[in-house]
UniProtKB/Swiss-Prot annotation:
Pfam families referenced in this protein's UniProt entry, alphabetically: GlutR_dimer, GlutR_N, Shikimate_DH
Gene: hemA1
Sequence positions that bind NADP(+): G193, T194, G195, K196, I197, G198
HAMAP family assigned: Glu_tRNA_reductase (MF_00087)
Gene Ontology MF term list: glutamyl-tRNA reductase activity; NADP binding
UniProt site positions, description: Important for activity: H103
Protein name: Glutamyl-tRNA reductase 1
Family indicated by similarity: Belongs to the glutamyl-tRNA reductase family.
Record remark on domains: Possesses an unusual extended V-shaped dimeric structure with each monomer consisting of three distinct domains arranged along a curved 'spinal' alpha-helix. The N-terminal catalytic domain specifically recognizes the glutamate moiety of the substrate. The second domain is the NADPH-binding domain, and the third C-terminal domain is responsible for dimerization.
Family annotation (InterPro entries): 4pyrrol_synth_GluRdtase, 4pyrrol_synth_GluRdtase_dimer, 4pyrrol_synth_GluRdtase_N, GluRdtase_CS, GluRdtase_dimer_dom_sf, GluRdtase_N_sf, NAD(P)-bd_dom_sf, Shikm_DH/Glu-tRNA_Rdtase
Organism of this sequence: Flavobacterium johnsoniae (strain ATCC 17061 / DSM 2064 / JCM 8514 / BCRC 14874 / CCUG 350202 / NBRC 14942 / NCIMB 11054 / UW101)
Role of this protein: Catalyzes the NADPH-dependent reduction of glutamyl-tRNA(Glu) to glutamate 1-semialdehyde (GSA).
Entry annotated with the keyword Signal: no
The organism's taxonomic lineage, starting at the top: Bacteria, Pseudomonadati, Bacteroidota, Flavobacteriia, Flavobacteriales
Binding site for substrate: T57, C58, N59, R60, S113, D118, F119, E120, Q124
Length: 416
């Protein structure tokens, strides 16, 4: 039988860094693309780690997993990114056991998002869990926890208004353009990159600017054509990027490249240019600001743009937290039961062995011994004894580890 219990010397950790302490440049150093994530999971498996989940988005890179010491997980991030241990120590965080559980709930439900109520992260957690599970790195604890977080996220989304109103990086970028670029409907807009943020930005641009001069460029042209077809936009080849940059009044860069793809060397400008870099790592070299007429805005600045919508969202935090507490309590109850279940089962086996021995002895000693009745009575007594122990271990005031150790010592049993 598979043993899903966490060995006592292992702890559940969440380690990583986020927008709270790490700026865009540092987050870029620690970002992990799909290949790096797979490599990290393979390394974890080779290191003997039994369960692990890794997420890497524009705003955070995090690992959730079991280890004897958090450095095992920190090393995995540093080994598979461009970040260093020294840099991590300055901006990173480490949460252990219940704090790590609390953190995943807050992240997955949008309460820890750079823009409050942004539920995009939950889809990342789902995808990351599926990836881990496919590689044999998701135990019962992790699966139950992720499902609990997904449940909390769904309930908060449907039962509160914490995600109401249009507030996202893509929406904020369009609002910035509308406020800072005159006659936007007649300007040339270039969108470079058609990932999730790029697509959302493009849809918002079409909706709010009424502009018919939006050009899309993507390294993979068919992705750009697919999006352009829906929105009736222009698509150009990646090889024409430098030419389109010259024509543009506004450029939105939302690529997933690991290094800058736009710098001053490819800009031959004859008019002012507004560049919005919505990428992590940054995909626009800051040297473009050395050119006259260029304004460079990064997503971190856009994320700080708060409005009435965001203030309204804050009113719904208590309701969201109440839902989290309810679901978290259910998870903790399950976790406690899972922790002591092997000990209770071992105790029941021990008592059954004592019963069998005693019934055998008495059946030989007593002439008219009624074994069937004795079996029924004994089983009821064993059930009552084990139930009493289980109820004690479920009690919030019980020190579970110490109680389990005491039970195993007194009855000379070993949970398997």
């Amino acid at each position: 039988m598979e043993n899903n219990n966490v060995p006592k010397h292992l702890y559940f950790y969440s380690v990583g860094l986020s927008y709270k302490k790490a700026d865009a440049e540092v987050r870029g150093q620690f970002s992990l693309d799909a290949v790096a994530k797979t490599r990290l999971l393979e390394q974890a498996k080779n290191d003997g780690i039994e369960s692990l989940l890794v997420t890497s988005t524009c705003n955070r890179t995090e690992i959730y997993g079991f280890a004897e010491h958090p450095f095992q997980l920190i090393k995995l991030i540093c080994d598979n990114s461009n970040g260093s241990v020294d840099a991590f120590q300055k901006v990173g965080f480490v949460y252990k056991n219940q704090e790590a559980i609390n953190h995943m709930f807050r992240v997955g439900t949008g309460l820890d998002s750079q823009i409050l109520g942004d539920f995009e992260i939950i889809s990342q957690i789902k995808t990351s869990f599926t990836h881990s599970k496919s590689m044999g790195l998701a135990n019962a604890f992790m699966e139950r926890l992720v499902n609990a977080v997904i449940q909390a996220s769904k309930r908060i989304k449907t039962e509160t208004e914490i995600s109401s109103g249009a507030t996202s990086v893509s929406f904020a970028s369009v609002q910035y353009i509308l406020k800072n670029v005159e006659d936007i409907s007649n300007k040339n807009i270039l969108l470079f990159g058609t990932g999730k943020i790029g697509r959302n930005t493009c849809e918002n641009l079409v909706k709010h600017t009424k502009n018919e001069h939006i050009t899309l460029i993507n390294r993979t042209k068919d992705k750009a054509e697919k999006l352009a077809g829906k929105l009736n936009l222009i698509v150009k080849d990646y090889s024409e990027l430098h030419l389109e940059l010259q024509k543009a009044d506004v450029v939105v860069v939302a690529t997933g490249a690991q290094n800058p793809t736009v710098d001053k060397a490819i800009l031959n400008l004859k008019k002012p240019l507004l560049i919005l870099d919505l990428s992590i790592p940054k995909n626009v070299n800051e040297n473009v600001e050395e050119l006259e007429g260029v304004t460079l805005i990064h997503m971190d600045y856009l994320s700080q743009l708060t409005d009435e919508t965001l203030e309204n969202r804050k009113l719904h935090i208590p309701a969201a937290e109440a839902i989290i507490e309810e679901i978290k309590e259910e998870f903790v109850t399950w976790m406690k039961g899972r922790k002591f279940a092997p000990t209770i089962n071992a105790l029941k086996e021990k008592l059954n062995a004592i019963k069998a021995s005693e019934l055998d002895f008495q059946s030989k000693k007593i002439a008219d011994f009624n074994e069937e009745q004795a079996e029924i009575i004994s089983n009821r007594i064993i059930q009552k004894i084990t139930t009493h122990f289980a109820n004690h271990l479920k009690d919030d005031d019980t020190m579970v580890d110490e109680s389990i150790e005491w039970i195993e010592k007194v009855f000379k049993i070993k949970a398997s």
